[in-house]
Amino acid sequence: MHHVADWKKEKVAELEDLTNSHEIIGIVNLADIPAKQLQTMRKSLGDNAILKMSRKNFIKIALENSDKEEVEGLADYLEGQPAMVFTKMNPFKLFKILEDSKTEAPAKAGSIAPADIVVPAGDTSFPPGPILGELQQVGIPAKIDKGSIVVTDDAKIVDEGEEIPKAVADILTKLEIHPMEVGIDLLAVCEGDTIYTADVLAIDEEETIQTLANAYQSAINLSVYAGILNSESAPLLIQKAARDALNLAINANILTSETTDKILSKAYAQMLAVAKLLSSEAIDDELNEKLNSQAAAAPVAVEDNTEEPEEEEEEEEDAAESAAAGLGALFG
């Protein structure tokens, strides 16, 4: 019978225990990360996550032996130099922290361009010399201008996904253009019964928060108009019911402590409206004076009324901003 070294068993057992004791388990790729930068990235995680490097087969065995059946699917995402990350952070926050910790790196011959590599037009600060020919050789339009070498136009020299030739890598390094990114690549994360891949976790935060805020506002509007009571709509529905009840009481001339002043004001306004239809000879001097006073005050009343909708709009904006601020917490 083949003997398995104790240290191997211990490594697998450690990964199993960490998998069973953490809510969020991720698979990352640490390939091509210098030791110094890896140490810096570990510090960026702080006490929020545990990063464990191990062999692929050790990780596979640990996932298979785990008490959580759903984590077995993570074995499909083992690439490069794999490692496991254990945390309580939600997957989106973990992804953001790892992405933010990435740093620029110079291109190496044979590396795959992560995006189109463009050399911008402008002064290179290099004096006339052999580098002019090197630039032109890799497709960068350059000339000598006022004692230095100048790139005359923006030049795309490598397309996204293409291999970077040695000559291009060398010239990019001389120009101090670092098109590569060095960092911990989060490949997949398991939370509960769901496995999130990197393409799902890579979202536009502002756009997502705005979309959720709009959906929240639409849901509130629907619940209010449909009369659906919940913790969010109840205060608005009560306010609406109070306004409707007040309007009904005023229009029906039902006297209460809330409506008496308004009904009297309405009756007074109606009296003045009727008086306007009569000739000045049919009404007394006191009423004529009131009609004249009302006519003089009319423009002011119109100006006051135009301010009310602005207040309502401000209240709606405040509600939307509060909703967006709360949703922002989802992404740390």
UniProtKB/Swiss-Prot annotation:
Superkingdom, taxonomy of origin: Archaea
InterPro entries: Ribosomal_protein_uL10 (IPR050323), Ribosomal_uL10 (IPR001790), Ribosomal_uL10-like_insert (IPR040637), Ribosomal_uL10-like_insert_sf (IPR043164), Ribosomal_uL10-like_sf (IPR043141), Ribosomal_uL10_arc (IPR022909)
Pfam families: Ribosomal_L10, RL10P_insert
Region (Disordered): 294-332
GO molecular function, one term: large ribosomal subunit rRNA binding
SUPFAM superfamilies (UniProt xref): Ribosomal protein L10-like
Keywords in alphabetical order: Ribonucleoprotein, Ribosomal protein, RNA-binding, rRNA-binding
Ranges annotated as biased composition (Acidic residues): 304-320
Keyword Ribonucleoprotein: yes
Quaternary structure annotation from Swiss-Prot or TrEMBL: Part of the 50S ribosomal subunit. Forms part of the ribosomal stalk which helps the ribosome interact with GTP-bound translation factors. Forms a heptameric L10(L12)2(L12)2(L12)2 complex, where L10 forms an elongated spine to which the L12 dimers bind in a sequential fashion.
Family indicated by similarity: Belongs to the universal ribosomal protein uL10 family.
PANTHER family hit by this protein: 60S ACIDIC RIBOSOMAL PROTEIN P0, LARGE RIBOSOMAL SUBUNIT PROTEIN UL10
Protein name, as recorded: Large ribosomal subunit protein uL10
Organism: Methanosphaera stadtmanae (strain ATCC 43021 / DSM 3091 / JCM 11832 / MCB-3)
